[in-house]
Amino acid sequence: MNIPGSTMKYVIFLLLLATLHSGCRSVNPGRAFDPQKTPQRPDFARLDHWAAHPDKKDPADRTPQGLQDEQATAGVDVFFIHPTIYLGTRGGENNWNAALDDTRLNAETDSSTILFQASIFNGAGRIFAPRYRQAHVDAFHSNDQVSNQRALDTAYADVQAAFEYYLKNWNRGRPFIIAAHSQGAVHAKTLLRNVVENKPLQQKLVAAYIVGWRVERDFFKRLPACTTPEQTGCYCSWRTWKKNYGRRKADEPNSVCTNPLTWTITEGQYAPKSANRGGVLRPFGVLRPGITDAEVWRGYLLADKPKFPGSILFIRRNYHIADFNLYYLNVRENAQARAAAFFKKKN
């Protein structure tokens, strides 16, 4: 079997991430949350405290081959909240919250989630992605529930502050999309409920993509789950597992699961690989149509093992890190369709 070097690097990258998410971390906080050790708050007037922003060049501006960055002409904004990159994989990553001046962590954030996830939305709107004092991955695994929550609260405070700064200084009445993954989705849920839902601002919400984290069907009172591809003022959510594993383990029927190939939430809704317009793995510039399928199953999205050169080595059963990327072009085109539908409805 001849596996290209770039593909092998990607497979190794996936295997390493799988190891990290399974609990084999080398560095953790190891003590209770201490507010005296919390890094300095961000200043969102500074462009370097944004991972992506229309006023600077960043990885969210890039596109796979054949696509165009349309931020300059878009009538919509996208507020993107990135997932946990602060994984405790190297010395110094032992605070409950990440520092904003950690240049290596920022570079990792930009070359991973900002490039591979935030860029999805540059066909629909201007992208604003704040840097924030993200909680250490241990905040999702530690037995110290008080410290876990305080770390997450610190991270969320930054996200809300960033959103409010964006609204005051750059939004200017424009409709917006909120998109988030994993830890970002945790904060997106709270942000939507605290700042958007049942408030005048909700009228400006094109859609929310709350991906990689559970959204209970009764979490929002006046913000519905999207049930059609062009519905607006609603949210989508999914968590992706390997199909055979998911059929045995998935059991959260009270969680919303959107099929990103059909944009419905019907239990058992299946879409074949032929409906997948293109996933994006490494190298970034290559779209991979038909990389996998999608089926809604008891609160989760089930997918066949993705097919790409070297995929025989990929044995992960939880496809969390690829929730967005397996359906890259479908999500991109859906965000564009919802934005167009929003303006059509307003006119």
What are these regions (language model features)?
Residues 11-19:
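Sec-dependent N-terminal signal peptides
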Residues 25-26, 157-172, 194-341, 345-346:
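Surface cap/lid and interfacial helix-loop subdomains adjacent to catalytic sites
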Residues 180, 184:
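Gly/Ala-rich beta-loop-alpha elbow adjacent to hydrolase catalytic centers
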Residues 1-11:
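Positively charged n-region of N-terminal signal peptides that target proteins for export
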Residues 187-191:
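Hydrolases whose catalytic domains are alpha/beta-hydrolase-1, hotdog thioesterase
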Residues 28-39, 82-174, 308-347:
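Active-site catalytic motif of lipid deacylating hydrolases and related acyltransferases
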Residues 74-76, 123-127, 172-175, 203-207:
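Loop/turn elements at helix/coil->beta-strand transitions in domains of secreted/extracellular proteins
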Residues 21-23:
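C-terminal motif of bacterial Sec signal peptides marking the signal peptidase cleavage site
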